[in-house]
Amino acid sequence: NSFVLDLTQDDWPRGSTLRKNRFPEKHLAEHGVLDWRFVGAGEWELAFDAFAQVEGRSWIGAKTDGRDAKFTRTGHGRFWRGAARDPILAGMMSAALLTIKGVPSAFSFDLDCGPTRYAIANSYDPAVARHSPGKLLAYRNLVHARGAGIRMVDWGAGDSGYKQTLGAVQGPALRDWLLVRPGVPAALARLLKGRWAASGQE
C-alpha cells in the first residue's frame, strides 16, 4: 500500500514533536553551521549536483553499484537534468536541502501536482545519521509545503515506519501491471507467468 499524509489536519505537526526535534537538531549543529534551504527556479542544476553528493555518500553509493541513484551522473541524473529543462516539469519540482558547514548532507525531492505532493527521493549522509537529518529536513519540508498550499503528500509504498513517524497513514493500494499484445507475445507471457511468480516480483 501507499502512504499518505493529510496536511490539513489541525493537530499536525504536534508542538511536542517540534520540541523533540530541537534535541537532535542541537547535536547536528555540533558538526557545523546548519543551512536549511528550499530550491528555487533556475537552481536545479546545482541542486541535482548537491543531491548527487549526498547519494554518493549514502547507502546507495556505498553498498550498490549506484545505477539506481536518482541524481548521479552514473545513475539517473541525466533524466532529471533533462526534465528540469522543460519549464512545465521544472515548475512541478520541489526540493529541500540541508547543508552542514557548506556540505550537502540531506535532501528531499518531490513533484507537485495541484494540491498533492508526490515524494520522489530523499537521502542523507550516514556520517550524521544518528541525529536524524533526513527526518528533521522532512518536517521542515512538510511545514513549508503546507504553507505553499499543498494539502496531501503521497509517499508511495515502502519504508512504512519512517513515513508513519511523520504522520502518514495507509493510502490506496499500488499494483504493477504488465500489458502485452495478443498473439505470440501473450502466449509467451503465459508460459513465463509461473517463473515471474516464483521470482517474488508479483
Give a label for each model feature:
Residues 13-20, 41-45, 76-81, 136-139, ...:
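Noncatalytic linker/hinge segments flanking ATPase motor cores
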Residues 52-53, 97, 121-122, 127, ...:
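General N-terminal targeting signals
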Residues 25-27, 58-61, 120, 127-132, ...:
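Short, surface-exposed linear patches
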